[in-house]
């Protein structure tokens, strides 16, 4: 795309650069002295603690299919590839992938759709200024690769950066005298700048899927499946806090816990469908029972 716009191609970054250097500036990172593998987990404005995250996937019956344990400061979308590849390699029959808003990225939407599967992702609230024009109020012109603002101004495609973001700009001389300039968020020169991802069409398709009856019905099952897995793991299997140090030890511990949860669910199913359960269920229930404590 950059060559079509007369721009130089983006050169690959040097792999030998220091990891803690970004754009010529050093970055600071909070590290635990007790467990350096743990990461600072931030949730909301008040919750900050060193933790691990178990990125988990399950089927519609609540059986855990795969898990990827990372430090608490690793975003869900970063750990997604490892979980997705692990599950799809073992269960090729997967057709629908239901996830929360943390996985709503262009890459994830593109990957799932190109694999012939259907992603189900939730609605995400618009976080911009409510008094200004919304992104969906700009009409896209595929012929000229430009956007038309509500007042008729044209935003031309000027460049594409290394993050896959397309930048569209208006002509300052044409928008400087616009009476609605404050509503579009133009700068002092009267120029409106708008960015969109090169894979935005995949997110648009995900939005269309979300509004279907199938998409609404499948997403409501999250609270009955994966959220129940998390609840049982924390409340019944002591997974609210880790008892080990180091990523390898925590990964083994989480995997063993999930294996036990799967076996427990399978045992309950086998008992409910057994002949002995049917016989005992038919017996009178007014007999005195001896309490058992565990």
Q: Where are the language model's segments positioned?
A:
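Anion-binding and metal-coordination hotspots
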Residues: 1-294
């Amino acid at each position: 795309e950059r060559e079509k716009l007369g721009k130089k191609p983006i050169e690959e970054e040097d792999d030998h650069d220091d990891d803690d250097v970004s754009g010529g500036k050093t970055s600071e990172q909070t590290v635990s002295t007790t467990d350096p593998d743990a990461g600072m987990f931030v949730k909301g404005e008040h919750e900050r603690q060193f933790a691990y995250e178990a990125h988990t996937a399950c089927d519609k019956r609540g059986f855990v299919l795969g898990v990827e344990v990372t430090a608490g400061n690793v975003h869900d979308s970063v750990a997604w590839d490892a979980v997705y590849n692990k599950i799809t390699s073992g269960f090729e029959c997967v057709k629908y992938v239901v996830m929360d808003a943390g996985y709503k990225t262009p890459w994830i939407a593109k990957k799932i759709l190109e694999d012939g599967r259907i992603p189900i992702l939730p609605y995400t609230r618009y976080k911009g200024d409510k008094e200004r024009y919304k992104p969906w109020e700009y009409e896209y012109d595929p012929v000229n690769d430009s956007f038309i603002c509500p007042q008729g101004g044209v935003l031309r495609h000027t460049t594409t950066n290394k993050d896959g973001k397309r930048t569209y700009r208006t002509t300052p001389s044409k928008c400087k005298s616009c009476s609605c300039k404050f509503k579009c968020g133009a700068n002092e020169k009267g120029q409106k700048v708008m960015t969109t991802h090169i894979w935005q069409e995949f997110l648009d398709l995900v939005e269309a899927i979300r509004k279907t009856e199938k998409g609404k019905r499948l997403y409501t099952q999250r609270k009955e499946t994966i959220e129940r897995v998390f609840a049982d793991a924390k409340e019944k299997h002591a997974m609210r806090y880790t008892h080990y140090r180091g990523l390898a030890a925590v990964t083994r511990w989480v995997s063993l816990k999930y294996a036990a949860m799967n076996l427990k669910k399978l045992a309950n199913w086998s008992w409910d469908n057994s002949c002995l359960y049917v016989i005992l269920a038919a017996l009178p229930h007014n007999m005195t029972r001896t309490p058992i404590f565990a």
